[in-house]
């Protein structure tokens, strides 16, 4: 029996490690394509691809190049009618100075103002909170906290 996916609500996966070989997601193009097809069958029509960006390991330019190459590898097997639309972004590991780092503007979700930020799990100092606010008010981005369940219980 086939499932009629047209009657499912349109779902958006807002945090996915779907690009092959980028981080802890699929290792191969085949695995990534199978995951995309499965997501589509479950009603997912849009995926925010949020590969890890660790500023202590690489600069934004090299990350963007790696991400573009990984996304390019998916194109050969891509079947748009059976797969969700992918919006490229990043899961940016917080670093002090984030609120003044203009290159992170290139790591937003699909060119939107939304920046997925992985915050430290320990209690945040006032300086860290101020820095996160600068992401909003200096860079003009809207930070979204990734894995809030890991860090918000530690906050006052």
List PLM regions with ranges.
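Extended substrate/RNA-proximal surfaces in nucleic-acid metabolism proteins
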Residues: 58-156
């Amino acid at each position: 029996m086939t499932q009629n996916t047209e009657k499912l609500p349109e779902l958006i996966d807002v945090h996915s490690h779907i690009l092959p070989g980028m981080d802890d997601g699929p290792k191969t193009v085949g695995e990534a394509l199978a995951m995309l097809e499965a997501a589509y069958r479950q009603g997912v029509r849009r995926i925010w691809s949020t590969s890890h960006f660790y500023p202590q390991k690489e600069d934004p330019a090299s990350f963007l190049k790696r991400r573009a190459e990984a996304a390019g590898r998916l194109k050969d097997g891509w079947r748009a009618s059976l797969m969700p639309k992918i919006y490229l972004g990043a899961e940016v590991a917080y670093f002090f100075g984030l609120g003044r780092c203009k290159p992170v503007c290139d790591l937003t979700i699909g060119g939107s103002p939304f920046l997925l930020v992985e915050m430290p799990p320990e209690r945040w100092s006032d300086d860290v909170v101020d820095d996160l606010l600068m992401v909003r008010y200096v860079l003009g981005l809207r930070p979204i906290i990734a894995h809030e369940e890991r860090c918000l219980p530690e906050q006052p």
